[in-house]
Amino acid sequence: MNRDLEAYLTKCRDQYYRGTPIIPDEVYDRIVENTTGEFMVGHDTEHRFAHPFPMYSLQKVFSGEDTPPNYQNKAVIATPKLDGAAVSICYVDGIFHDAMTRGDGKYGLDISDKLKHIAPRTLSMGKTLFSGLRQITGEIVAPKTIKNARNYAAGALNLKDVEEFKRRDLTLVVYGIQPYVGEYWLQDMKMLGNWFNVITLGDYNEFPKDGTVFRVDKYSYFEDFGYTSHHPRGAYALKTREEGVVTKLLDVEWNT
């Protein structure tokens, strides 16, 4: 791979993780598939903070092309895969502590000043607050009636003007909590529905989607399937390949 191509892909990846992609997501995903192992892209961790729990990606399974994982008759839950910007929100003893962009899954940008206007300040059950640290993960989404809704949502997280962020038509939909509370993921989603919009309690047809997520419901089984460095094996995203997607980037010519 020549250096110009590597530099271009590095730029694409950096912009992708910042939520301001310079090429369509589907094209970026295909480029990554075709160049895996050819080069390593580093990320500047300055001004970024570590997630208490990694925010893994999902294995992509393309309909008609790939074979889905075999979960050995374990109960599996299907939910829509919303197309927005992934975030994490941390609560300490039930009180909002901070919020971050997904970033590269290990490190994200602090967006506490914005998310505190969307996420609840406390998570209490009666007079009891959750003890210890809980990391809630979810998606910031915008209505699909907005042009380039994903970029609209992701771009909002990079705004310096909090008042402008508050004026944007954005919704937080959550789909995860760590450490786990109950024995089943569906059980925890029902609990989180006391405070949040959760992925299991609506069809969310007003928001853009880019597939369907399937995951093993019982946490012990989910963990038994293990993880790769990229994704949990107990879940995957079923997607449809868009027509006209570029399948391989061969070279880059720079305008001079």
What are these regions (language model features)?
Residues M1-T256:
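RNA/tRNA-interacting regions in translation and RNA-turnover enzymes
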